[in-house]
A protein has these predicted regions:
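Acidic/histidine-rich alpha-helical segments that form the ligand environment
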Residues: 35, 67, 84-114
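Conserved alpha-helical segments that form or flank metal/cofactor-binding pockets of metalloenzymes
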Residues: 40-82
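Glycine-rich, flexible loop/turn motifs
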Residues: 2, 35, 40, 79-80, ...
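Structural signal for well-ordered, non-membrane alpha-helices
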Residues: 26-33, 59, 63-66, 111-114
């Protein structure tokens, strides 16, 4: 069910183009949480706090994109298996990361999404 005045084919194309963006943002949120949980070292506190802000933003943005997909009459697909199936992003290392490593990794991921 669509809530748009766009022609159906146009709405479908726009929704299809938004789907990968939504998955990227969900993945950024999850990767950010992994970094948040594993950051250590001298700059732990400021990095940990900055990650909270970024993670919240990525989650809200993914929600906004998903809602736009719905408005266009499509079903958003944002399950973990959808992220895996689409091959979104590189895996974050499962390791303790110092602040610079965590932020560098996330900066690279953000750049790949942008």
């Amino acid at each position: 069910m669509a809530w748009t005045v766009l022609p159906q084919e146009t709405a479908r194309k726009v929704a299809d183009s938004l789907q990968p963006t939504m998955l990227d943002l969900i993945d950024l949120h999850l990767v950010g949480k992994q970094a948040h949980w594993t950051v250590v070292g001298e700059n732990f506190q400021p990095v940990h706090e900055r990650l909270d802000v970024l993670i919240d933003a990525w989650r809200l943005w993914s929600d906004s994109v998903a809602e736009r997909i719905v408005i266009l009459g499509a079903l958003p697909k944002g399950r973990a298996q959808d992220i895996v199936n689409e091959g979104v992003g590189d895996e974050i290392p499962i390791a303790w990361l110092d602040g610079a490593e965590a932020m560098s990794y996330l900066a690279d991921r953000v750049e790949s999404v942008a």
